Curated annotation (Swiss-Prot):
This is Ribosome maturation factor RimM. Residues 95-177 form the PRC barrel domain. One of its GO terms (cellular component) is cytoplasm. It comes from Rhizobium rhizogenes (strain K84 / ATCC BAA-868). The PRC barrel domain binds ribosomal protein uS19. It is found in: Cytoplasm. Residues 170-190 are annotated as: Disordered. Residues 181-190 have a biased composition (Pro residues). Belongs to the RimM family. Gene3D superfamilies: PRC-barrel domain, RimM. It holds the Pfam family RimM.
C-alpha cells in the first residue's frame, strides 16, 4: 500500500460494464483515453490499479484493470476515486500559459488593488464552464467562473490569481470596493 504525498484526482469509477470486469469511469484528463499514460492509479485506501484496456464511450471511458476479472469485482469499485502523484504529471509538455488545475489550489485570489477574496480550494466542471472555489477565513466558500473575464492573470510562482471581482460575481458595482462588508438590508443610516 502506498500513500500519495500530493494526490491528483484522475478519475471516478462508475458502474460495471459487461461481465469481464470492465468499469465505466469519468476521467478528468484532457484526453480521457490517456488515463493509463500517467502510471498506476491509486485509491485513497492504498490500492493500486493498472489500466490494461481503455476505450471511449458516451461521456465516459470503459476501463479494464489488472486483477478485476468479473462483474462482481467491477461493481465493488463503483464510486471509487483514482489518483496519481502530482510528480507523475508531465510538466515539460506544458506551454508557458498552460498549467494543471491542481496547481491552482492554494493560490490567493486578489483584485488589482490587492484586496484578497480567498484562496482557491477547488476547480470544478459542472458542464457549463469551469468554476473556481474560493475560501477565506471566516467566509463561506464561493464559486467564481474560471473565465478570461473573471480571472485576469495566473501567477503560479507568486502564489496569486488576479481577478475582476465584478466579472467574478463577487461585487455588484465598483462602489462595493470600499473594503467594508455590505450593510444588511433595512439597516442603513444616511
Amino acid at each position: 500500500m502506498t500513500k500519495l504525498e500530493n494526490p491528483v484526482l484522475m478519475a471516478t469509477i462508475g458502474a460495471a460494464q459487461g461481465l469481464r470486469g470492465e468499469v465505466r469511469a469519468r476521467a478528468f484528463t484532457s484526453d480521457p483515453t490517456a488515463l493509463g499514460d500517467y502510471g498506476h492509479l491509486h485509491s485513497m485506501d492504498g490500492r493500486i490499479f493498472e489500466v490494461l484496456e481503455i476505450r471511449e464511450a458516451k461521456n465516459v471511458v470503459i476501463v479494464r484493470f489488472r486483477g478485476v476479472n468479473n462483474r462482481d469485482a467491477a461493481e465493488a469499485l463503483n464510486g471509487l476515486e483514482l489518483y496519481i502523484e502530482r510528480d507523475n504529471l508531465p510538466d515539460d509538455e506544458l506551454e508557458d500559459d498552460e498549467f494543471f488545475y491542481t496547481d491552482l489550489e492554494g493560490l490567493e485570489a486578489v483584485d488589482d488593488k490587492g484586496t484578497a477574496y480567498g484562496t482557491v480550494s477547488g476547480v470544478y466542471d459542472f458542464g457549463a464552464g469551469d468554476l473556481l472555489e474560493l475560501k477565506g477565513p471566516g467566509k463561506r466558500p464561493v464559486l467564481i467562473p474560471f473565465s478570461e473575464a473573471a480571472v485576469l492573470e495566473i501567477d503560479l510562482e507568486g502564489g496569486k490569481i488576479l481577478i475582476d471581482p465584478m466579472a467574478a460575481g463577487l461585487i455588484d458595482s465598483p462602489d462595493d470596493l470600499t473594503g467594508k462588508p455590505p450593510k444588511p438590508p433595512g439597516k442603513t443610516k444616511e
